[in-house]
Amino acid sequence: MEPATWLRDPSHYPEQMTPLSATVWFEAVGLGLHDAARTLAAPFGGFRTRTELGWAYEGELDPEWEHDPRVLREAALTLPARWADTYRPRTWAITHELWEHRPELPPPTEAALLFDRMWELVREQWTLHFLVVLPAQFAAELFRDRYVELYGDGDPLAPYRLLETPHADEAIDVLARRARELHVDHLVRDLAVQHALARLGESSPGRRWLRELGGYLDPVDGVGGRSRWHELSLTREAELPQLTLEAIRLALAGGGPAAPQSTAEPVPAELAELHAACAPAFELKESHTAHIDYPGLLATREVLLGFGRRLAAEGALDATGDVWLLPRTVLRAALTEELDLRAIVAEQRAELARGLAEGPKPYLGEPPQDAERHATLEKFYGSGGRALAGAGASAGIAEGVARVVASADDFARVSTGEILVTATTTPAWTPLFRSLGGLVTETGGILSHAAVVAREYGLPAVVGAAGACSAIPDGARVRIDGTSGAIQLL
């Protein structure tokens, strides 16, 4: 049944999507969540996906199955073993198969079959994504419910702090130290990313440092598949390491390693056994990205660019990058049929331009009900707040200069100790957290990426503060309370 209401989720889709990314990655996300929810006999049915003028919307589905809480509980408690034995090996097998695809080479019929195989693999990979993420989230709720039974809910973040561990991106510290040792730190610290990379390549010490950076960004052993968010047309860190170099710049400006400020809290004896089962599962909520999201998206992007190169070489497209303006079904058809792709590209480009000018609608279809998402998902998505107030997500009070970040180009303006104000964050932003004084996001709940990582760093954070990016002037001094969610302009 078609959803009656379609909601925006700016915490995950803050910007417009290109037609190809929307009909490959975004559609696979919706299908994967639905398939995983069925396998787990979950109390919700997932969602369908659609875009309008490039803006993404989700329509929630009712489950077509009977909810069985025992299935999801068992999946949560056995997730670490399933991850090691099944999910992680399979997702890497998918990524490696995608890397082996060469769309430029085969004749048309075989190229179409290769495209179909790519789509099968992407769908499977995002089903695996949710077979990990949903049990990981449920593990946290199992632990939280037992904690509240024993100790009450006076501190809503207390059970999650017990599950989380202090985070430190030691590789960033190592790269910053090596830049100093090789006397190239001034290039990383003082130049824009592209200019820094060019200057580093001009000297032997610089090239040596770039090789070490390359190890960190390796798609298999490193984080090369990171980007500021999941849109497939965006360059990844392996192609242009903007986020990484900005994190190293902040580390250099800070003068030395930044140890995490948070410390692990002792686990009460009554919770020790459940904690031992739930903590490793919950850890996968964040760490899975290095095995599924980063390498999988990078491999998918490279395959789709291969099809773009093929069509550009055949003269069907003016440029390889125009492939992002083709919906998946159109790209598939173009491999074996003669289509006027230039007209389609022009039409889609005009739609995106119109969407950028008009902005997103708050919803499509019927007005949303008060509780449109299942409660299990609300702590991840958040329910929105009000300007200059949100949900306290990581305890502590921070006072400092607010730096409003609307795009990746704004990262260069962030200085050590400033309070980052942004619509949302993704796991790719994690290296930046180490140098911040505080964090405010317009979206997300207390189990969102921003909230979890802020607690791991001991970084005061407020999430779900709707309108914060427009209500807080860039450069203003603010005070945030990561317990109450209060934000005060000074």
Regions found by a protein language model. Give the residues of each.
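A generic structural signal for short, non-catalytic loop/turn and secondary-structure boundary residues
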Residues: 318, 395-398, 473
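Phosphate-handling DNA/RNA-contact segment within nucleic-acid enzymes
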Residues: 375-419
